């Protein structure tokens, strides 16, 4: 190598020298030729030949040296050419070389074209010679992927690693580059010369995972492999994997395994994990000693543990008892260590009684002289504590438990039940168990390990109840009530008792105060203050109680005075006044200094802060807060003062400010509360175990890069592309356009546009679809509609209101980014992006509900509906609230027998709320099995005879409902509901979801025809039908029409033709008024048939039950509908809509209506009379408006928005259904609108009727079966099981041997003969299946599993999900509350509230006293795109309403007049009048 390099260098130098000489000679020759006048075109004769001669390579170098020399020569010649190409052409003028050589030289450089000879601008704009750097970020990943594939194929592998007889092929270079262990092995040790290397003490499974990580940078860490994986990673020096295992172990740390994890970390030198485990043991010592790991420790480890000064124990008795328990675990072997252990127990801190009665009489200590001396020392310490000194008399200094900031209830803008807590270490907010009742303006205090929420306002009444929260169990209870009703009161803890001071009782401000003794559970009055004080702040300094500021309802003035209470004398005295009047000020005590924060003086909201020194009896000003705040919560911790929420006079705040007295400065916490709230209770408590686990689960979910967002008013997105989801967890593409970039790719699925798969039931309605790039479908158009018509947040709608005045310079500060008011920068960005209509831009997140999961992995687990067991703590527990009569579908398929011979599932279908096969509605003739019978909660759809059995041949008029939505929860969280049948079409980019109250009622909406087919001319099914539902009847072979339907031309209801519900009374009339017609005259005529529920005799008779006026209204509508049937030529222009509310529009010329109609029909004015005699105009719409709607939409009438508008749905929800729900009893609290849509249905199939009938479940799309869900009431398990067994015996032989289960509230315990069926067929209803809220407190939280996953393979398991804020309280809590309150709970039902978070249907105000609502006007341009330009202006109906300010309303600051007098409500400008309930 050295000789070759030297020869090559010498040869290259010779070439360079020759070229240099040749160049010099060439220049001289050219000059001579020019001087002699020779023709430059003639070649030179032997000039410069010596310099131009090619130097031959030395012998022996071969072709390689020759090639290298030629390349070097060509580079030098190119440099010469570049020096002269600007002023001469060597090819033309000659350069001592032949023209052929010159050309060959250029050819070798690929530069024969003219562009290479000139300095021209390159197409990409870069100059020649520009120095740039190219970087390909995917190069490394692609290279490693290629090497990994070669490794799997055993290509170019040069080493074989062996562990436990398992061989793994790999590349030395790759392993050495990632692991210092392999680098040293392959470079310096004997293994560098071995092709097969055996690794000792390395688990084969762990080695495979680590080798995969080296090539892919991905490794899966779970409970099964973390131990062997960490050991192997530590040995192979893969520190990243070792750290990942340590992080995982931190998330799994609890009292049962912390000792083992600490020892494991110590063995493998995982310092961070070791410190974390030791800190955890110190903080949770009292829980750790209760598990077996402690009993299995060695005596040295026990001594190290109990000798630690930092362990946190309630008393020294616990230390003594754990030592005795350890000795008793193995007395023969451990008795010898008794004296050593007892020397580290600090017996002097035990009580004298405990020493004499327990310690001195312990058998294990008898006869032990050392222990007797220790007992004597302890008794001596009690007699002479100052003279007894030893290591055992030094008190312990336990490490501080991690603290959390607990925020309870509040006003947002009405009283809420939400509870959330802030982890000071993680700087994140989490949700806790909600309060059993709505509560705001209450007092909050911490007494012992319990949190007390005292008094307050529940949205309608001032209360005197007290709710008690146990952080250890995350549950609420109650204690004895106060003597007086109080809201906006002050609460503090003094001498182990709770003091409630002042407040407002609904009539006047209070000066009284009372005290609660937890030992006796009794409230009693104490001395009253000298002044009435509501919105008062209290604090305790040096054992004295201070009442600061407030509002005096008698003088109607905000107060600056302060009173002090002495519990020893039971007296109040006045102290120094503040410099400013403050009502609603937050009060906190920090370092024995009393701070009064914010507040207001009439309309002026303050941000100033004052500090009171009780030693000098004086107030002083400190630094102002960043924002003006009143009614904020204040708490002190670790030398800092925390101010939480409040309002600034305009909106509620979600930010938290922290004051540091050392620097006299404020800062804002980086994380905001989930919602802005004022009048909230705030306290600081130790972080309990359950919340520690919740935080660990959240951290684990974050480590999986899954962003979670709980939208309080989340709904299923209505866009088609958002509805089509993936088949397995790998594609968590949620509806509503939630981004699935963070989730693994799913197997390719063919789009099923006619069979939407709703992967997500919690997607926010305001979030547009993310799949805007799909081609070949209407996805782009649908997505554009969804984005254009996405409703703006309530806080994004710029409302014209006068902001409250604030202190000087307060308005100059930017407002905090709260949940109720976005930051100005955000508003400006939104206005720039969409100047005409604000858009709601949300991050793309993955949503998922474990309780109703549609992510099927195939196989026997393909349609797993509900978790049968949940993982909680150390193992799996059976979910007693969800207990099916049959086996688990995700278990072994052998134990499940197919219900149908052609079913694609091995397990039978579980009973479901979403089961769309009705017993009363469907008796499908099934080959080989006779009449099939199905379960369905809609077993009696009383308003729709078409869904019932038609005749003896049992051919159903409707095969199935298209899509069903169902859920349970609270109406105040969602204004659109469940059990609504919604076809696969959207309404302004979003579904219009309506429902009912589950009191024996069923409702659904059917919108948007699928085509423009005409009605069938006959009854035999010979005509065409454009509705999927009519296939089962129209073309059924050999089907006949029942006699009762003989006069009906089309015995099938067009899916765009009806909007009905079987809600009774007044609500049924509102259903009638939203009756919609299709786009054909024949179809409209069909709707006048008795089968049409909106004008049927059945509906008319039931409507009459609401009163004579209701019947008259129904009759008027039927008559109006009959009279308004236009001709087929102008049917699209004059179809009846009955829109609610009335629509005003100016008449347009005929040419502007698209030529659809030139004749203006009379205006249709419908009026419904209520029982009170009030007449409310429900709908009014001109024919011109209808023509405009028709011309702008689909001429065939298949545009949903041409028939029903969002304003109509909104009006119905707010003014009809919501009061109905509010008027019901407390059972309404289990109405949740978590929308659950059926994946598949027979009527959606495009297959033939024969194929539909052959498979009762329809054509399976994704997993073999539609998804189901069931909720089971276990309290009736025994009786229901007996009923089911009995019903099985009495079944017909041809029928399926399964009892029927109805979950409607109207349950019947006995059997009922069905007269429409064959003799012997009975209907049985199992009351065990009800509308109950399923809940497992620790593992199955609020309708969804906290950590449940059916997949046994870890990489297929879905990420953990936190509880959604939109869900209801636990069923168990509700049951306990009902049992505790008894009949009183039925009488004192709580008023639901409007959603706290933005919702498109939320633009209204509620008067909870008389259940009236007043929608706010909606600008016409907001609905322009939604209704196709048909709406120009909306005048919402006038209703009685009490003026309510959602922000500034205070117990003692508003006075209103009764709405019964029909007088306008008034509000004092200064907000200082007494408020009467």
UniProtKB/Swiss-Prot annotation:
Gene3D superfamilies per the UniProt record, alphabetical: 1.25.40.420, Kelch-type beta propeller (2.120.10.80), Potassium Channel Kv1.1, Chain A (3.30.710.10)
Biased composition (Low complexity): 20-46, 763-813, 820-839, 1166-1192, 1374-1391, 1456-1477
Compartment annotation: Cytoplasm, Cytoskeleton
GO biological process: actin cytoskeleton organization; cellularization; female germline ring canal formation; follicle cell of egg chamber migration; oocyte karyosome formation; oogenesis; ovarian fusome organization; ovarian nurse cell to oocyte transport
GO molecular function: actin binding; ubiquitin-like ligase-substrate adaptor activity
Region (Disordered): 19-62, 76-96, 108-137, 744-841, 1119-1200, 1291-1326, 1359-1416, 1446-1477
Cellular component aspect of the GO annotation: Cul3-RING ubiquitin ligase complex; cytoplasm; cytoskeleton; female germline ring canal; female germline ring canal inner rim; germline ring canal
The entry's keywords: Actin-binding, Cytoplasm, Cytoskeleton, Developmental protein, Differentiation, Kelch repeat, Oogenesis, Phosphoprotein, Repeat, Selenocysteine
Principal subcellular localisation of the protein: cytoplasm
Biased composition (Polar residues): 1125-1137
Top-rank taxon, per record: Eukaryota
Domain BTB: 157-223
Tissue: Both proteins are expressed in ovaries, male testis, ovariectomized females, cuticle, salivary gland and imaginal disks. Kelch short protein is the predominant form and is also expressed in fat bodies. On entry into metamorphosis levels of full-length protein increase in testis and imaginal disks.
SUPFAM superfamilies xref list: Kelch motif (SSF117281), POZ domain (SSF54695)
Annotated Kelch repeat ranges: 404-449, 450-496, 498-543, 545-592, 594-639, 641-687
Protein name (Swiss-Prot/TrEMBL): Ring canal kelch protein
